Amino acid sequence: MTKVLANALVPIFAGLLLGYFAGLWRRMDNQNVRTLITFVMSFAIPCSLFLAIASTPRAALREQAAAGLALAIVYAVLYAVSFVWTRFRENLNASDSSVVALTLGFPNSAAVGLPLLASVFGSRATVTVATSLAIGSITVSPITLAILERSRRGSAGVSGTGLSGKSSALRQIALSLIHSCKRPIVWAPLLGLAFSCADLTLPSFIHRSLAVMGSAADGSALVLTGLVVSAQKFEIRGNTLIAVLLKNALQPAIALGICMLIHLNIEQTRYVTLISAMPCGFFGVVFGRDFDSNPKLASSGLIASYLVGVGSLAAWIVIVNHIG
């Protein structure tokens, strides 16, 4: 168990700490990271997501429908809870609340999920990990981007009252959502899904070219996350502890309950629950940095979730292995 967790978590911490100390010691500029954000979010991760989905046989994807539904519900529930909590209890604006909600609601299955589930359950679990990435990329991610886009355009102050004002606000949200779907991080997994469903095969030279770009996703994303976090103060406060409780304890518990409610098979229940138990993802922090929205709660919660994750992941691995 210790070796499995070490193999999965030590590389994650190494990447985060490399970026963190590189920024802290001024080896890298932690204030002007837009170019690195563009590389990670518009090239590396989209290539990785596209290949993961496109390379999955259609029959295997069909078997993931129930797991995908469970993951979508799990992500949406914690996203909504986190957004409402930070918006009305912590008094954050809509942009900052969406960044925190995505950080807590979308686990780091990109960097942690693949090695951890492969170590615990074998290579057969990687399809569910790819599904989890696709679900997060086409649900809570575009919602966050829509909120950030709307805030950037100043749509929070839409004029009008009554039905006309509400209609205008809804129209602005819809336009922002459509605009967010133009981003590679959103449409790449959808394109991969289309390739898989159509049984299309990429030429080997294109596959290898995309694989080269996609292979840079994990390391560059972790370094970028650490770099962004290094520009902020890490604070352990009451809301940080609440954030960790929501992510590391509540989300996997919700996942387990939903899996049982929809009668998901034991194997998929284990996968979905353990994916939900992963520490915070980096999409929220990176999206926020791209839109100049950097709530301390997001970065503090992210770091704290990894520190607590060493113990909480071990506990959830034991729990899921006793299911059934």
Residue ranges and their predicted role:
Residues 1-324:
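Alpha-helical transmembrane segments of multi-pass small-molecule/ion transporters
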